[in-house]
């Protein structure tokens, strides 16, 4: 449908058409037979006012078109166009939108034309209200179903829930130029196309997500076939792949920013507290040497109130965010992924953690994602807090059968919080890796990533180990009656429980199920609450997840200081809140012989979910309340069932049920009574809306300025959708030297927009960050480095091919060297240009085995490759490392006349490098 709009050559015959004219004609009658609407057709030929009836009557519109040779006509009910000559549907939306385009780009009129082909700044002005009112007359966007491809309801429900997360959807709609990848299967492109179809003004009733379904099956074979899968597993796999395809390295620009800001001391004093405590400096006093600025930095600590948020709305004809401004929807700043860190707590120092609060810090950029589904870096020490009793971090590994509806949650007993004191934290360095670890970020990590501080204390020596772990979702246990009683007595004895309903959601599984469900609800409503037990709320599940655990018995803590198993205690708190909080309720249990589903109703708030009780004192997030965006529900048993999603439309604020290709409006009470499985919450902030309106007012002033400022388009998208967008991050289109990386220059217009001086100064004073950019140029330093890197790669790969060719031609080599294939694959990716980072020193430790005599031999079954001595010498001279593992071949001399043929002996020896 999208391709046909450029193929019709008859659009030039259309006269001046406005929507008001079409609406006026729709209230008339057929000029031939006098019949009234609906489904009248208006001729679009220049100076032709004819209105005729359609095929449901005498079809005078077709007769008129054939007689007069007027090819184009428009349906006055649906506003769809038909070309009789092309015999297909065409589109008029570009002509209808023409009056709107001039009002949305004021910078083209008031600023000199740019020398570089950059897009105008997407700032709304006062007269955009008219375009919004015209948009409101159209059908709400986003209400598009998805066809079931065969037990694919788990995918459809997950995609609908993600589609109704405005920060993510707005990125794919407004920042399409940033969706670039050379990684297969290019799932981000398929998702972008799907989102564009779902949110198009001329949306179909449903779409068929074939391309995305095919791509996810290539990524994870578990989703191949037509078996029912877990929607949570699909969400993780999809977002992992989107991150991998869209991730970009974080540019270390501390020195650059300091150099640019050194001449503005007054501004520096105003924003002295702009940098929020990072996890590096929160855990360390001397970790600033290897830190770069990232999205996560920046808080207005210089003022008494929290840092305010601003909005620059995008073009009114496309932006979802303008609708959000009218409805006062609230958003927040999704902070970034960080590595796990270990903290050692000495028993002979202070007995509180107050010292942690006083650590000066600056924000830390996100770290690389793990390739595992949970995407949490594995700690190298005992500070990893995932035990068999209850995971104290958001990491949980699914082990259920692939054909079941969900994966099994681990047993989650809720324990009383023991009384104990924590010691002052001191950092243990994680140990330098041989290869420099590159930090990455993406729109996925910006929106969905939060972090948790997990601590384990030895009750004998009081040593405390801490781990900072990144989470994408929180998998919460559903507490039973006994656990709920302990929680309420120990934690919520002074906090009244929020009211909620006890009824489960209506499961559309036939009349029998409906009747049974109706009777059950009636019985529940007539029975005292003490009979069924207390209402389980989402806050109870959060309290159960964050409750302290005692480590004793079979689950004792291995203390590094005591060198023994000791009784301990562990707990966790949220260190950084995400923009979108994804909550997964553990409704499925898979035991050895059977599986079952927990059908307990969990009451969850539609607005005002407050996470303050679960925050660490060192939490950097200012906004702690969330509003519900969408909820995925599962109807059925552990072995089979059906997924649907309830989502709030961001344009009109109404709730809708998405059941494959069927979309139905529902009341919010239906959502409250739903049996939630996966919930998406979004930060709320009224202050953000007011600040956005202030920026719109500044933009409408149209003050003439001599300087134009370039700002990151991606950061402006955060303005549109985040409550806490953080400091301006122009590093996303700059290199570490302050110029444009050569590989980005050809699409720089997709990365930046132009701001007038008054808007830039306001944003810069409020949010900090930067750096200020008035001129775009290709970085000559990066160009030289790229050329040198290309030359190095070419020399290394040519030399290897030459040496390996000679090795293959050698019939009986006297010595063969072994090299780890893991390291070799990293080197191969580097020389082929797939990875910009060199592999680091050769690491043969994985394929080496130490014998009792101290000699190192080749490990049996090791993943290794064979190279010549010359090749080993060449690679070792470039990268170093080891140990050296050589397989020597020698022919033994015959010991007697019976030994006629000589015996070949293969001796593996290793020489430490």
Curated annotation (Swiss-Prot):
The record's annotation in Pfam families points to: DUSP, UCH, zf-UBP
* Region called Disordered, residue ranges: 256-414
Compartments, record wording: Cytoplasm; Endoplasmic reticulum; Cytoplasm, Perinuclear region; Cytoplasm, Cytoskeleton, Microtubule organizing center, Centrosome
Q: What is its EC number?
A: 3.4.19.12
Q: List residue spans of UBP-type Zn fingers.
A: 6-111
Q: Binding of Zn(2+) 3: at which residues?
A: 43, 48, 64, 70
- Organism annotation: Pongo abelii
Annotated positions of the Phosphothreonine modification: 257, 376
Indicate which residues the UniProt annotation says bind Zn(2+) 1.
8, 10, 83, 86
In this UniProt entry, the residues modified to Phosphoserine are: 111, 131, 133, 304, 367, 407, 412
What is the stated purpose of this protein? Deubiquitinating enzyme that plays a role in many cellular processes including autophagy, cellular antiviral response or membrane protein biogenesis. Attenuates TLR4-mediated NF-kappa-B signaling by cooperating with beta-arrestin-2/ARRB2 and inhibiting TRAF6 autoubiquitination. Promotes cellular antiviral responses by deconjugating 'Lys-33' and 'Lys-48'-linked ubiquitination of STING1 leading to its stabilization. Plays an essential role in autophagy induction by regulating the ULK1 stability through deubiquitination of ULK1.
Indicate the secretion signal residues: none
Please name the top-level EC class of this enzyme. Answer: hydrolase
- BP term (GO), one: protein K48-linked deubiquitination
**Bias kind Basic and acidic residues: ranges:** 258-278, 315-331
Q: Which PROSITE patterns match?
A: DUSP, USP_1, USP_2, USP_3, ZF_UBP
**Active site annotated at which positions?**
153 (nucleophile), 642 (proton acceptor)
What is this protein identified as? Ubiquitin carboxyl-terminal hydrolase 20
**Segments forming domain USP:** 144-684
Q: What GO molecular function annotations does the UniProt record carry, in alphabetical order? A: cysteine-type deubiquitinase activity; cysteine-type endopeptidase activity; zinc ion binding
- Classification via Gene3D superfamilies: Cysteine proteinases, DUSP-like, Zinc/RING finger domain, C3HC4 (zinc finger)
What is the protein's major site of localization? cytoplasm
Gene label: USP20
Q: What family does the Swiss-Prot or TrEMBL record give for this protein?
A: Belongs to the peptidase C19 family. USP20/USP33 subfamily.
């Amino acid at each position: 449908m999208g391709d046909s709009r450029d193929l019709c050559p008859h659009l030039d015959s259309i006269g001046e058409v406005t929507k008001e004219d079409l609406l006026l004609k729709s209230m008339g009658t057929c000029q031939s037979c006098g019949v009234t609407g609906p489904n009248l057709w208006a001729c679009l030929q220049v100076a032709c006012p004819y209105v005729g009836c359609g095929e449901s009557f005498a079809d005078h519109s077709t007769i008129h078109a054939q007689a007069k040779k007027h090819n184009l006509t428009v349906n006055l009910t649906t506003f769809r166009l038909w070309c009789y000559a092309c015999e297909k549907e065409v589109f008029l939306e570009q002509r209808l939108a023409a009056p709107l385009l001039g009002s949305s780009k004021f910078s083209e009129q008031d600023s000199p034309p740019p020398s570089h082909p950059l897009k105008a700044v997407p700032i709304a002005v006062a007269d955009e209200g008219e375009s919004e009112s015209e948009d409101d007359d159209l059908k709400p966007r986003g209400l598009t179903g998805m066809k079931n491809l065969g037990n694919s309801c788990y995918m459809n429900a997950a995609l609908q829930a993600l589609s109704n997360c405005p920060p993510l959807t707005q990125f794919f709609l407004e920042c399409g130029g940033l969706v670039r990848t050379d990684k297969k299967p290019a799932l981000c492109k398929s998702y972008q196309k799907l989102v564009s179809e779902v949110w198009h003004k001329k949306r179909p009733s449903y779409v068929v997500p074939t391309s995305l379904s095919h791509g996810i099956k290539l990524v994870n074979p578990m989703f191949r076939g037509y078996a029912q899968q877990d929607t949570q597993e699909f969400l993780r796999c999809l977002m992992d792949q989107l991150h991998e395809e869209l991730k970009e390295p974080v540019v270390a620009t501390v020195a650059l920013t300091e150099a640019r800001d050194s001449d503005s001391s007054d501004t520096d004093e105003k924003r002295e507290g702009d940098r929020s405590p990072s996890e590096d400096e929160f855990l360390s006093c001397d970790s600033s040497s290897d830190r770069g600025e990232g999205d996560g930095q920046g808080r207005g600590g210089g003022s008494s109130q929290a840092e305010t948020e601003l909005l620059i709305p995008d073009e009114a004809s496309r932006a979802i965010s303008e609708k959000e401004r009218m409805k006062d929807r609230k958003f927040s700043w999704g902070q970034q992924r960080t590595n796990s860190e270990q903290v050692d707590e000495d028993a002979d120092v202070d007995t509180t953690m107050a010292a942690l609060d006083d650590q000066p810090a600056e924000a830390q950029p996100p770290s690389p994602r793990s390739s595992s589904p949970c995407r949490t870096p594995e700690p190298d020490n005992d500070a990893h807090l995932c035990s068999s009793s209850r995971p104290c971090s958001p990491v949980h590994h699914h082990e259920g059968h692939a054909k079941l509806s969900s994966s099994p949650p681990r047993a989650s007993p809720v324990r009383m919080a023991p009384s104990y004191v924590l010691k002052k934290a001191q950092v243990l360095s994680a140990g330098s890796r041989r290869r420099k670890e590159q930090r990455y970020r993406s729109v996925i990590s910006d929106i969905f990533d939060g972090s948790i501080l997990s601590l384990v204390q030895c009750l004998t020596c009081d040593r405390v180990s801490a781990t900072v772990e990144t989470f994408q979702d929180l998998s919460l246990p559903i507490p039973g009656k006994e656990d709920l009683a302990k929680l309420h007595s120990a934690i919520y004895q002074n906090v009244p429980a929020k009211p909620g309903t006890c009824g489960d959601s209506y499961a559309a599984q036939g009349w029998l199920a409906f009747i049974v469900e109706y009777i059950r609800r009636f019985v529940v409503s007539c029975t005292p609450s003490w009979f069924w037990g207390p209402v389980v709320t989402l806050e109870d599940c959060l309290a159960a997840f964050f409750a302290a655990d005692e480590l004793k018995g079979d689950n004792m803590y291995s203390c590094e200081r005591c060198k023994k198993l000791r009784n301990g205690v562990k707990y966790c708190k949220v260190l950084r809140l995400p923009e979108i909080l994804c909550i997964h309720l553990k409704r499925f249990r898979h035991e050895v012989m059977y599986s079952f589903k927990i059908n307990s109703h969990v009451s969850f708030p539609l607005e005002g979910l407050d996470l303050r009780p679960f925050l660490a004192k060192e939490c950097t997030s200012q906004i702690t309340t969330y509003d519900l965006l969408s909820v995925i529900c599962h109807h059925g048993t552990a072995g089979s069932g059906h997924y649907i999603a309830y989502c709030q439309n961001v344009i009109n604020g109404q709730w809708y049920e998405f059941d494959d290709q069927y979309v139905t409006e529902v009341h919010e009470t239906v959502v409250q009574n739903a049996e939630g499985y996966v919930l998406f919450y979004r930060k709320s902030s009224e202050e953000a809306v007011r600040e956005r309106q202030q920026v719109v007012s500044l933009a409408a002033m149209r003050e003439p300025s001599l300087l134009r400022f370039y700002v990151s388009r991606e950061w402006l998208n955060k303005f549109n959708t985040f409550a806490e967008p953080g400091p301006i991050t122009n590093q996303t289109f700059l290199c570490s030297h302050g110029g444009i990386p050569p590989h980005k220059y050809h699409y720089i217009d997709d990365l930046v927009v132009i701001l007038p001086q008054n808007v830039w100064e306001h944003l810069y004073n409020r949010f900090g960050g930067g750096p200020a950019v008035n001129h775009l140029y290709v970085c000559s330093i990066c160009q030289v480095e790229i050329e040198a890197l290309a030359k190095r790669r070419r020399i290394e790969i040519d030399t290897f091919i030459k040496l390996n060719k000679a090795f293959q031609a050698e019939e009986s080599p006297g010595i063969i060297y072994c090299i780890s294939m893991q390291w070799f694959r990293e080197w191969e990716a580097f020389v082929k240009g797939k990875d910009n980072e060199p592999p680091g020193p050769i690491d043969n430790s994985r394929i080496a085995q130490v014998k009792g005599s101290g000699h190192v031999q080749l490990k049996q079954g090791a993943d290794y490759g064979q190279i010549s001595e010359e090749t080993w010498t060449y690679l070792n001279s470039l990268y170093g490392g080891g140990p050296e593992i050589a397989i020597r071949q020698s022919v033994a001399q015959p010991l007697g006349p019976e030994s006629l043929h000589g015996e070949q002996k293969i001796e593996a020896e290793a020489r430490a490098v």
